[in-house]
């Protein structure tokens, strides 16, 4: 897929860059694999705001039931079409298996309509095939990687992303993330070969506020223009944040505060994102 640029006929088209989706399926999604999706507008079941300034409005969407488990084992399937999914940044593919069942999978780059894909152990190392980490050679790009066997893919699911197998350590595979972190994952976990589609997603320029509203993104109000009752930065005469470091509405530091608190999985991190070796063994 290529990028689309626009002539500056209006202020909103000046500088706008979008992804050209001319090669994707133009019809409706597969009816048996979609369900309604209600917008919660950033509220929970009690009506309390859980996502400030970021949710509300936007175009109505149907949720595509993407199979992250790749549970159809040892049966070849054919890619029938590649589709746009409004709920995620990468594209999805509709796969029909020999018994007539259909599944939506994440679509990797270089996959084409008519290609064959398979799930299971000891399959061919080919883009779109899914297999345990123990069957994948070192250095291969993979996506949709499980963290626990049978739990479904959790890592590398957004547009243009992938991770790499950098080595083996007993019953674990060493996975190098795009952030530079190296992590141990059980070799029985499933992963799919290839780099995910739509790598140009990172190059788009929205161009106008209206397109952000179509995506469900509302304007963000700065804390410095609020009253003291609404935000720690509020109040004062003129534009001042009160002389304190930037914080969230609840007072948590907004600049570089470490928030990770899952010590039980520290033992699986071989190298942190900042390239220092983990001292906790």
Curated annotation (Swiss-Prot):
GO terms for biological process: cytoplasmic translation. InterPro entries: NA-bd_OB-fold, Rib_uL2_dom2, Ribosomal_uL2, Ribosomal_uL2_bac/org-type, Ribosomal_uL2_C, Ribosomal_uL2_CS, Ribosomal_uL2_dom3, Ribosomal_uL2_RNA-bd_dom. Residues 215-281 are annotated as: Disordered. Residues 258-269 have a biased composition (Basic and acidic residues). One of its GO terms (molecular function) is rRNA binding. It comes from the Bacteria. SUPFAM superfamilies: Nucleic acid-binding proteins (SSF50249), Translation proteins SH3-like domain (SSF50104). Part of the 50S ribosomal subunit. Forms a bridge to the 30S subunit in the 70S ribosome. This is Large ribosomal subunit protein uL2. It comes from Pelagibacter ubique (strain HTCC1062). The lineage of its organism: Bacteria, Pseudomonadati, Pseudomonadota, Alphaproteobacteria, Candidatus Pelagibacterales. The gene is rplB.
